[in-house]
Amino acid sequence: MTTHTEPRDTSAVGKTKHPRNFIGTAMRVLTTVTGSEFAEKYQIREPINRIAYQATKTGFQTLGAANRAFKAAQGGSGKAKRLTSTPKDYFNLTPDDEQQMIAETVREFATEILRPAAYDADAAATAPEEILKRSAELGITMINVPEELEGAATERGVVTNALVAEAMAYGDMGLAIPLLAPSGVATTLTNFGSDDQQRTYLPDFAGENVPQSAVVIAEPKPLFDAFNLSTKATRVPSGYRLNGVKSFVPAAGSSELFIVGAQLEGKPALFIVESDSKGLIVEADPGMGVRAAGMGRLLLQDVAVPTSALIGEGESSAAAYRDVVRLSRLGWSALAAGTAKAVLDYVIPYVNEREAF
């Protein structure tokens, strides 16, 4: 199947013409981010400048590195880096000035880059590779990685991440899903990963070539229960063996890393699985309405992972799984809200301006 490198002249919503070409728009968005207080606060101006320079040379070609060799960074303290939340005296979900700026920047990116590409991406049932790499340039993944691991995060940003998801889905949910999936992996490793797991994987999520990845929970069965998984993990002398089928995996064919949910001794747990693991098979499984996400299934047939692949241990493993499920539900809700807002903004002027006869 051929994937168009240039989006069509019409968008998937309203069939409106492109305001700009892809490279020009992307460069303008990067320039906006580079000059913002957001870039200054999170110290991402320099890496974004490097990306912008590279973009002018390559025309935003993909610099992917499939199945890269993940290696632990040196100098670990043995203690994992954790982000904390700033306590507030009252419950208030109103975005502050910084969150508002981030949301507006992402929404502009989504409207001017994602939406024009959505029609072709949906037809091809895959997201264009050049678009899959753009989230790194906005710092979306970087703000979920602690500063000590080359990221930009100083505290947990649940509300900020929800605003980003809502703004991204305003452009197109199908493309937003694979773009945001690596942030879910980075957040999981930051919140629950061990020191060794964090040093092995998180630095890549703060770099210029973020690995495509996903947290994989869903399974292809009716009345799916996230806390009663059919995928099983069995202890073996060398670690664990995973068997089962996972579904609804975004950008499954191009992902380099998965965090897989599996039942371990009666309780759900999370395991880190690299894409080149023996026994791991990826099948295409397009999802209606989100075909652009490149959804697929993971077939795990005696996939061997080391002891260090388990996220958490004992009760902390189960607690990590519960929190990841809660956060994923919040993320899906934010995506739905962004999509609904886009529909509303299209329908209102259409109803007011249409001529029935």
Task: Please give the residue ranges for each predicted region.
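Glycine-rich beta->alpha junctions and the first turn(s) of the following alpha-helix
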Residues: P95, V282-F357
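A short core secondary-structure module
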Residues: N243-E283
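A structural signal for short hydrophobic beta-strand segments in well-ordered beta-sheet cores
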Residues: T231-T234
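A short, Trp-centered hydrophobic/proline-enriched beta-strand micro-motif
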Residues: E208-A218
